[in-house]
Amino acid sequence: MGVRVLRKNYLLIATSIAGLSISFAAQSNDQDKAEVFFENNMRQSSEDYVSSKIEQSIENRFRNLEIEITDLDGDDTRYSIFTVQPLYENLDAGRVTFFQGSIIALDDSETLNLGLGQRWLLNDNKIIVGLNAFYDNEWDVGHERMSIGGELLTSVGDIRVNSYKALTNGKTNDEGNEEKALDGMDMELALPLPYLPSTRIHAKAFDWEGEDGASDLEGDTISLRTALSYGFELEAGTTSYDKSHNQDADFVSLTFNVARFHSQQYVEQPKLISDTAYQLTDVTERRFEKVRRQNIIVKQEQTSGDFGIRFKGI
């Protein structure tokens, strides 16, 4: 009788232990699955977050991109890529700092432009005053140049002045001719047409100092520039030269601005017609506008032709 009781109790204990073991194993297995599930979701969430931040950063940088194609007198085509990147912005203090860079391809040569700009917003953000400095490098031949510039931007007109200084001496190009980068300056006045705030007429005068006894290259450029829908901009004009062997040249330029496209693709479009001819309004949106300047290095080339000297880059 005692043996039977002991055997029965032993079986009950063994069964209970087995049940507890199975239950513990099941719970342990569920816990492992939960840990794996949680770990995988955490990893996926982290990867999605990092990927989203990278894509957002790239997208924001890409939006500050401008692509320009210019047909020069039906002969040469110039391709340009610009970017303007904010470095500092304090609208309460009315001050912004930015970087501007560009790469320009023309006549089998490429030019790199790197610049820093500082702008101040004055008179309730109705006036922008700016200063800038640039470094230019035409690496195919090795020309280098720097410039400093100033600008005044308003809704009723703009004024820009740039002074250029060559940093290199004579260089030999692929044709075996000597080229020299020139010092010079330009001044531009831009005025919107009455009742057409998105259309401006630009008048620019320039003067490039000739080398080795050559006459200065002087002239002016007159153009009409208008903003179109979805980030496009069209400019057409002509360049005339004074006392130079260079012939007058016409040009047409089409620009696509990615930032303007993203902000205008749904509702915001350029204001083509205004109720008033001229009105001084807020120009805060222009604080990171591209600096207008002569990005191609102007050069004087010594040739063996009839005239012996010709100017390039303008």
Which residues does each predicted region cover?
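Bacterial N-terminal signal peptides that target proteins for export
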Residues: 3-13
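Flexible, glycine-rich linker and terminal segments associated
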Residues: 28-58, 167-202, 208-213, 227-235, ...
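Residues on the lipid-exposed face of transmembrane beta-strands in outer-membrane beta-barrel proteins
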Residues: 81-85, 114-118, 133, 148-154, ...
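Repeated loop/turn-to-beta-strand initiation elements of outer-membrane beta-barrel proteins
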Residues: 62, 88-98, 122-131, 156-161, ...
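N-terminal signal peptide c-region/cleavage motif recognized by signal peptidases
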Residues: 23-25
